[in-house]
């Protein structure tokens, strides 16, 4: 798979796990009352945008025949992110004052735990997809045929 376009898939593959890890850290800060909910809520949308860009660009760059596993992982990641967003909004609304009174306390605790677990799944899927992209995506500069005097070996080093 040739990595064309801007931003490149390889750069998104490096950036996305970091963005998700920052989001998880902000969520942990809110959970343990070190931060307010605003940093976690505010960073959720840029993090989601970066994740969806990675998944959508991977879907468009990966051919169905050669890279079916990348396409499946991208679709799974997009699905998980949408579920995580819905869980996050409902968990946020459950903590509002007055709280959601139609849900029992145990259901709210289960909702927050599900949001936390889905966040861990999003991080795991992001790392796995990023690793696959870094393994499969070839930068444009390396995909062009080398001249007779130049040979490329390994990860972009000249022989």
For each feature predicted by the language model, list its residue ranges.
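Polytopic transmembrane helical bundles with strong interfacial aromatic enrichment
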Residues: 1-159
């Amino acid at each position: 798979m040739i990595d064309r376009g801007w931003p490149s898939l390889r750069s998104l593959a490096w950036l996305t796990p970091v963005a998700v890890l920052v989001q998880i850290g902000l969520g942990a800060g809110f959970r343990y009352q070190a931060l307010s909910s605003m940093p976690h809520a505010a960073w959720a949308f840029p993090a989601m945008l970066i994740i969806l860009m990675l998944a959508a660009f991977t879907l468009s760059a990966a051919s169905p025949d050669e890279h079916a596993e990348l396409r499946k992982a991208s679709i799974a990641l997009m699905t998980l992110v949408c579920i995580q967003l819905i869980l996050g909004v409902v968990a946020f609304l459950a903590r509002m004052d007055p709280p959601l009174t139609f849900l029992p306390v145990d259901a709210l605790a289960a909702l927050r735990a599900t949001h936390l677990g889905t966040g861990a799944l999003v991080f795991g899927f992001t790392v796995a997809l990023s690793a696959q992209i870094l393994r499969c995506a070839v930068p444009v500069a390396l995909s062009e045929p080398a001249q007779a005097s130049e040979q490329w070996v390994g990860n972009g080093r000249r022989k």
